[in-house]
């Protein structure tokens, strides 16, 4: 949980499969008095079925989703994001109304935080404790927790 004095919850979680995303959303739904917003993606060069599972869990369990990049490896990051979005549409969600697709994970986190209002909960899922993002063969420093804190600070919230 990230607390920088904002009037909504922010949770960073490692959930990166459909089942894990479903479970974290189910648990948070019980305590959420507003909207449940999720930032989530799917890793490249992994079982493509995970993309469907993540999209379906987000479509069914969250009120709003921002689909984004998560360890794309050698795959085109935006292609992965669009595929997740297409699965969400197949589950009845509307692009632009129920979900957004943003390749840049920082921008996706920022957008989710900007969308949040009092009593909402923003879940940043998929990376959790991990300290890097994988592009091709390169591991670049990355920390969802720190990015969420940085973006909350830019929105005027300080711990």
Feature names for model-found ranges:
Residues 1-159:
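ATP-dependent carboxylate-amine ligase
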């Amino acid at each position: 949980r990230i607390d920088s004095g904002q009037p909504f919850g922010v949770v960073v979680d490692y959930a990166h499969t459909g089942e894990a995303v479903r479970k974290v959303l189910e648990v948070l739904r019980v305590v959420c008095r507003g909207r449940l917003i999720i930032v989530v993606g799917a890793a490249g060069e992994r079982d493509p079925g995970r993309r469907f599972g993540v999209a379906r869990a987000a479509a069914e369990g969250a009120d709003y989703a921002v689909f984004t990049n998560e360890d794309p490896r050698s795959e085109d990051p935006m292609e992965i994001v669009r595929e997740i979005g297409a699965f969400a549409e197949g589950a009845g969600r509307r692009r632009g109304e129920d979900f957004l697709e943003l390749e840049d994970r920082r921008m996706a986190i920022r957008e989710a935080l900007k969308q949040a209002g009092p009593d909402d909960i923003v879940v940043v899922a998929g990376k959790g404790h991990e300290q890097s993002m994988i592009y091709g063969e390169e591991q670049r420093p990355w920390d969802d927790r720190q990015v969420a804190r940085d973006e909350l600070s830019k929105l005027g919230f300080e711990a």
